[in-house]
């Protein structure tokens, strides 16, 4: 039985990447040792991480005046690192909230700086409203938002207008899923465990002029200047996770880069949303313009049926479809590594389940 993993994270990884890692596990680059065993400051590992950054920069066409850091602590760590590094001049920040994770980031930031919070969802709806904040953004050290909320399946495609202010984005769940203009952002950060690789690595893209202004009490592990000067290795990094990310970057380049992945992601999501829209049995309540390409949420008419759906889907090899405890229902996370065959298998099961239970 073929298994498709719809987990929101840690998520499905490209099969060819896992197969390469399997082949190299005991003998990496003919050294007779695993990549997990070599020195993180050794010649081969340093060459690997240098190439990984080059590949990542190529994928996103990252301008030269941006640093790329490979850190630890996940996006939650960055919830604290962002204000410690950036909230240093005006003493207050603006958080645009659209769901659980953007609200959680705002809550953490309040430990370090004054936070103004604006809920950008329209009243009672999973729909994003006005995104022009250029008239107020200049009074803040930065403006923070989360372009994809995994729990509700809300994605913000348009970049908020903040004028000349610093825009910060938590792209943990949609990084590398579509093309973006990096120059519109001051900082982009993302946990790896959805589209970049396994859990353990956090990528931070930060504009150079924003480095070097951390408050003095900022721990060195979160200080962008210190990490940048030390190649993201002031401590021993999660070497195996970094290695796997490097393989994912090469895989994405071989597929044609982000442009091709975005095309495939739109195709996958359209298949699933089109099926949901024609069904009276399943429901998705996100406004069409804000439907996530990465996390598709849906439900039946009652919790009992939802539980039955998840159990029977799991038995059929369609794993991790249970929705987040905050929202319930079901959630199909269809990141870059999910093949279109997985979407078709899910739709086939959904059609069968509807016929048997409607």
UniProtKB/Swiss-Prot annotation:
<feature type="binding site">
    <location>
        <begin position="75"/>
        <end position="76"/>
    </location>
    <ligand>
        <name>pyridoxal 5'-phosphate</name>
    </ligand>
</feature>
<dbReference type="GO" id="GO:0006564">
    <property type="term" value="P:L-serine biosynthetic process"/>
</dbReference>
<dbReference type="GO" id="GO:0008615">
    <property type="term" value="P:pyridoxine biosynthetic process"/>
</dbReference>
<keyword id="KW-0663">Pyridoxal phosphate</keyword>
<keyword id="KW-0664">Pyridoxine biosynthesis</keyword>
<feature type="binding site">
    <location>
        <position position="150"/>
    </location>
    <ligand>
        <name>pyridoxal 5'-phosphate</name>
    </ligand>
</feature>
<dbReference type="InterPro" id="IPR015421">
    <property type="entry name" value="PyrdxlP-dep_Trfase_major"/>
</dbReference>
<dbReference type="GO" id="GO:0030170">
    <property type="term" value="F:pyridoxal phosphate binding"/>
</dbReference>
<feature type="binding site">
    <location>
        <begin position="235"/>
        <end position="236"/>
    </location>
    <ligand>
        <name>pyridoxal 5'-phosphate</name>
    </ligand>
</feature>
<comment type="pathway">
    <text>Amino-acid biosynthesis; L-serine biosynthesis; L-serine from 3-phospho-D-glycerate: step 2/3.</text>
</comment>
<comment type="function">
    <text>Catalyzes the reversible conversion of 3-phosphohydroxypyruvate to phosphoserine and of 3-hydroxy-2-oxo-4-phosphonooxybutanoate to phosphohydroxythreonine.</text>
</comment>
<dbReference type="GO" id="GO:0004648">
    <property type="term" value="F:O-phospho-L-serine:2-oxoglutarate aminotransferase activity"/>
</dbReference>
<dbReference type="InterPro" id="IPR000192">
    <property type="entry name" value="Aminotrans_V_dom"/>
</dbReference>
<feature type="modified residue" description="N6-(pyridoxal phosphate)lysine">
    <location>
        <position position="194"/>
    </location>
</feature>
<dbReference type="InterPro" id="IPR015422">
    <property type="entry name" value="PyrdxlP-dep_Trfase_small"/>
</dbReference>
<keyword id="KW-0963">Cytoplasm</keyword>
<feature type="binding site">
    <location>
        <position position="193"/>
    </location>
    <ligand>
        <name>pyridoxal 5'-phosphate</name>
    </ligand>
</feature>
<keyword id="KW-0718">Serine biosynthesis</keyword>
<dbReference type="Pfam" id="PF00266">
    <property type="entry name" value="Aminotran_5"/>
</dbReference>
<protein>
    <recommendedName>
        <fullName>Phosphoserine aminotransferase</fullName>
        <ecNumber>2.6.1.52</ecNumber>
    </recommendedName>
</protein>
<keyword id="KW-0032">Aminotransferase</keyword>
<comment type="pathway">
    <text>Cofactor biosynthesis; pyridoxine 5'-phosphate biosynthesis; pyridoxine 5'-phosphate from D-erythrose 4-phosphate: step 3/5.</text>
</comment>
<dbReference type="InterPro" id="IPR020578">
    <property type="entry name" value="Aminotrans_V_PyrdxlP_BS"/>
</dbReference>
<dbReference type="InterPro" id="IPR022278">
    <property type="entry name" value="Pser_aminoTfrase"/>
</dbReference>
<keyword id="KW-0028">Amino-acid biosynthesis</keyword>
<feature type="binding site">
    <location>
        <position position="170"/>
    </location>
    <ligand>
        <name>pyridoxal 5'-phosphate</name>
    </ligand>
</feature>
<feature type="binding site">
    <location>
        <position position="41"/>
    </location>
    <ligand>
        <name>L-glutamate</name>
    </ligand>
</feature>
<dbReference type="GO" id="GO:0005737">
    <property type="term" value="C:cytoplasm"/>
</dbReference>
<keyword id="KW-0808">Transferase</keyword>
<comment type="subunit">
    <text>Homodimer.</text>
</comment>
<dbReference type="InterPro" id="IPR015424">
    <property type="entry name" value="PyrdxlP-dep_Trfase"/>
</dbReference>
<feature type="binding site">
    <location>
        <position position="101"/>
    </location>
    <ligand>
        <name>pyridoxal 5'-phosphate</name>
    </ligand>
</feature>
<comment type="similarity">
    <text>Belongs to the class-V pyridoxal-phosphate-dependent aminotransferase family. SerC subfamily.</text>
</comment>
């Amino acid at each position: 039985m073929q298994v498709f993993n719809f987990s929101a994270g840690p998520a499905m990884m490209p099969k060819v990447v896992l197969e390469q890692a399997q082949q190299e596990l005991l003998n990496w680059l003919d050294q007779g040792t695993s990549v997990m065993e070599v020195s993180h400051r050794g010649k081969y590992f340093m060459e690997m991480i240098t190439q990984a950054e080059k590949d990542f920069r190529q994928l996103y066409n990252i301008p030269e005046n941006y640093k790329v850091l490979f850190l630890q602590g996940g996006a939650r760590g960055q919830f604290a690192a962002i204000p410690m590094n950036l909230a240093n001049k005006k003493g207050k920040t603006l958080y645009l909230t659209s769901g659980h994770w953007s609200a959680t980031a705002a809550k953490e930031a309040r430990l370090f700086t004054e936070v103004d919070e604006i809920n950008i969802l329209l009243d009672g709806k999973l729909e994003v409203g006005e995104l022009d904040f250029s008239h107020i953004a200049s009074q803040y050290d930065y403006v923070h938002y989360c372009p994809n909320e995994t729990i509700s399946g809300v994605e913000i495609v348009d970049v908020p207008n903040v004028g000349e202010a610093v825009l910060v984005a938590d792209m943990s769940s949609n990084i590398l899923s579509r093309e973006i203009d990096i120059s519109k952002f001051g900082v982009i950060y993302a946990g790896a465990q959805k589209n970049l690789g396994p859990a353990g690595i956090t990528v931070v893209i930060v504009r150079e002029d924003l480095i070097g202004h951390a408050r003095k009490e900022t721990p060195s592990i979160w200080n962008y200047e210190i990490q940048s000067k030390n190649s993201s290795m002031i401590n021993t990094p999660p070497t195996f996770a970094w290695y796997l990310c490097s393989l994912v970057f090469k895989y994405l380049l071989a597929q044609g880069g982000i442009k091709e992945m975005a095309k495939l992601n739109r195709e996958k999501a359209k298949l699933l949303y089109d099926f949901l829209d024609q069904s009276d049995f399943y429901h998705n309540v996100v406004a069409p313009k804000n439907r996530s390409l990465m996390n598709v949420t849906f439900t039946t008419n009652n919790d009992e049926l939802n539980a039955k759906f998840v159990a029977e889907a799991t038995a059929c090899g369609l794993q991790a479809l249970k929705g987040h405890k905050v929202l319930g229902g079901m959630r199909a996370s269809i990141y870059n590594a999910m093949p279109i065959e997985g979407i078709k298998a899910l739709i086939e099961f959904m059609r069968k389940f509807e016929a048997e239970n409607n």
